């Protein structure tokens, strides 16, 4: 079995439906996705499974939180271009492993439009539905999801899985693991939707919105932004 990790740095922003989000300065949506009951009376272990957005703006305090959690393996679901544009920070003395796909997992992060278009809440919602519909058929995503599951099965200690925002690709990765472990669909959905309660929405907007608006030529409708930055039950 894997080693244990100390759950420290927790914020006071628990929704009551799962472990609290970790308090961070520059990492969006950082949380433990363990703790859920499984069929047969078991429970997914807490303190071993973490998820988040990218760590490109991680502060020194964030890196200390990362180190204190005992994370030995990072599974980065982003493709090469994303990782080169937004290199993640790690603690100076961290000697863990980063698992990644050597290629592109997405032509652009799922919440960023590929080309100039008039984005309304409806068109943004429809775009995100297509992202989730295509994901199971994306060979790169199939490969990295397999790498993720193998890493959890074979490696000791705590792990962290992340993409750009920690909500779409990461949300499906967490759901795949929960499904395998026998977590109920209701709890899987609740975990997926907890992204919308993350107290770090400003970090995601800061990292995503300027680039999106630059490509589209102006400010976006707030309802459209919400469809891109949040998750919906329909996406699951």
Give the label of every model feature segment.
Residues 1-4:
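Compositionally biased, low-complexity flexible segments
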Residues 7-160, 172-236:
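Cys-dependent protein tyrosine phosphatase-like superfamily
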Residues 165, 169-170:
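Ser/Thr-glycine-rich phosphate-binding loops at phosphate-binding pockets of nucleotides
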